[in-house]
Amino acid sequence: MKNLNELSATSFGKGSKLQLIEQKTCIVVGIANSRTRLRIGVLLSELSEYQVDYISSESETGKLIEEADLIIGAGITAYEGVLRRKPVIVVGDYGFGGLVTPDTFRKHYNNRFRGRINGAKEESFSLENLEREICKGFNLTFQELQMMSNQTITLQNI
């Protein structure tokens, strides 16, 4: 995972000129519900330190998830994110499910990554909750992400 606002040096052309390019941490949003997607967009617009990409078609899902540092989504987007060892925050038709962790993975999986367990349709959530979960997501270890990916594969094969 990239560090927040990591700077990289790149050489262009024949000269020895070096240009610093700021690479923002990439968050990919894959939410089918238009109201929820709009709400997430409004909240993320307050957090300028992230590059935010939205999945708009199935054909680009794999590429965007692979390039992402963190996924916000529901259903197949969240499922794919876990499989690819990405931090995933579940936000779906049933509200704000929060960060998928080793402790919450099985509940989210059984709920098909649709939102908060026992959540209500289109329930509201705050920028503070989203921001807190984003920070927690970037603190997940590779081992934790790998473990959840392996569990997904195991459950898929049952």
Regions found by a protein language model. Give the residues of each.
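Conserved catalytic-core segment of nucleotide-activated headgroup transferases in glycan assembly
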Residues: 1-58
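A short, well-ordered alpha-helix in the C-terminal region of glycosyltransferases
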Residues: 136-156
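Catalytic binding pocket for nucleotide-activated donors in carbohydrate/polymer assembly enzymes
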Residues: 77-142
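An anion/phosphate-binding loop that grips the pyrophosphate of nucleotide cofactors and donors
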Residues: 68
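A short acidic, amphipathic alpha-helical/loop segment
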Residues: 39-43, 63-64, 80, 84-86
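Conserved active-site histidine-acidic residue motif and adjacent donor-binding/catalytic loop
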Residues: 32, 53-64, 76-78, 94
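Metal-dependent phosphohydrolase cores
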Residues: 1, 86, 152
